[in-house]
């Protein structure tokens, strides 16, 4: 299958499985990915997702231009009916971790930018190279990259199509960790299991406060956080958390 899904211990492991094509996205893999994100978003057993690419060379290099058919209708009809094919389906309050195991280029970097936590192997490369093929980083790249790293660096990448290394990505704050390729999967699993062991509603509310709050004035963001704290106050999981703390045991959260 061009995209695989494995669920273990409340973690969804999503793998782009076209290593022979640098894990680029053709119509079939795009459709698979859309279905998988719908499952991740709605399955109550899944609390966090890890996205990576198969093999050791590439996370994702965006659209497979060799397998992308020419458009059969005007842009307006396609956009107004379907919108974007992938990123809207990643919009959820469950966290998504990108384990970037090689090239994250074009749409591949844009997908990584839509994730909440990005970790990388030492051989990873990052770039939005669309200007080199007379295109534009239209999924989210022109907007998300300048918000993720310093403006000057983002503009250099966008306008020249130059790539940066994993070490540079770490220095600019595009990723939180860089490890040897052999250690990447274990690090992703460690972070995912830590998140999955926390109270699901608390994790989702925390993500919501952080994501929505950054577009609010500070005072409004703080007030919104207070509101979410109140929403969580009477949950069964919060009661369980306090009880487990008093009994010196691990809490058994249920997402209720």
Curated annotation (Swiss-Prot):
Induction of its expression: Induced by toluene.
Active-site residues per Swiss-Prot or TrEMBL entry: 110 (nucleophile), 130 (proton acceptor)
Recorded catalytic activity of this chain's protein: (2S)-[(R)-hydroxy(phenyl)methyl]succinyl-CoA = (E)-2-benzylidenesuccinyl-CoA + H2O
Entries under Pfam families matching the protein: ECH_1
GO BP field: fatty acid beta-oxidation; toluene catabolic process
Entry keyword annotation includes Lyase: yes
Keywords in alphabetical order: Lyase
Bilayer-spanning residue ranges: none
The protein's Enzyme Commission number: 4.2.1.180
pH dependence, record text: Optimum pH is 6.2.
Pathway named in the protein's UniProt entry: Xenobiotic degradation; toluene degradation
Keyword Lyase: yes
Molecular function as annotated in GO: lyase activity
Subunit structure: Homotrimer.
Function: Involved in an anaerobic toluene degradation pathway. Catalyzes the hydration of (E)-2-benzylidenesuccinyl-CoA to the corresponding alcohol intermediate, 2-(alpha-hydroxybenzyl)succinyl-CoA. Also accepts the N-acetylcysteamine (NAC) thioester of (E)-benzylidenesuccinate.
Membership in a protein family: Belongs to the enoyl-CoA hydratase/isomerase family.
Protein known as: (E)-benzylidenesuccinyl-CoA hydratase
Organism (species): Thauera aromatica
Gene of this entry: bbsH
């Amino acid at each position: 299958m061009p995209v695989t899904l494995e669920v273990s211990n409340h973690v969804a492991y999503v793998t782009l499985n076209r290593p022979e094509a640098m894990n680029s996205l053709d119509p079939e893999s795009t459709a698979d990915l859309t279905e998988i994100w719908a499952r991740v978003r709605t399955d109550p057993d899944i609390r966090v997702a890890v996205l990576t690419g198969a093999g050791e060379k590439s996370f994702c290099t965006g659209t497979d231009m060799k397998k992308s058919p020419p458009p059969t209708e005007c842009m307006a009809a396609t956009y107004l009916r379907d919108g974007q094919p992938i990123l809207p389906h990643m919009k959820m309050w469950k966290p998504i971790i990108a384990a970037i195991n090689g090239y994250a280029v074009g749409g591949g970097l844009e997908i990584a930018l839509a994730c909440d936590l990005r970790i990388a192997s030492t051989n990873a490369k990052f770039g939005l190279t669309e200007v080199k093929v007379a295109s534009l980083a239209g999924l989210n790249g022109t907007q998300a990259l300048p918000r993720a790293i310093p403006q000057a660096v983002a503009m250099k990448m966008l306008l020249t199509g130059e790539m940066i290394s994993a070490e540079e990505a770490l220095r600019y704050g595009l990723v939180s960790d860089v490890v040897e390729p052999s250690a990447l999967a274990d690090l992703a699993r460690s972070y995912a299991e830590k998140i999955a062991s926390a109270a699901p509603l608390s994790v989702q509310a925390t993500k919501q406060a952080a994501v929505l709050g950054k577009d609010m004035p500070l005072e409004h963001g703080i007030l919104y956080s207070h509101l979410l704290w109140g929403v969580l106050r009477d949950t069964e999981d919060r009661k369980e958390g306090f009880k487990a703390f008093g009994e010196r045991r691990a809490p058994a959260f249920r997402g209720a």
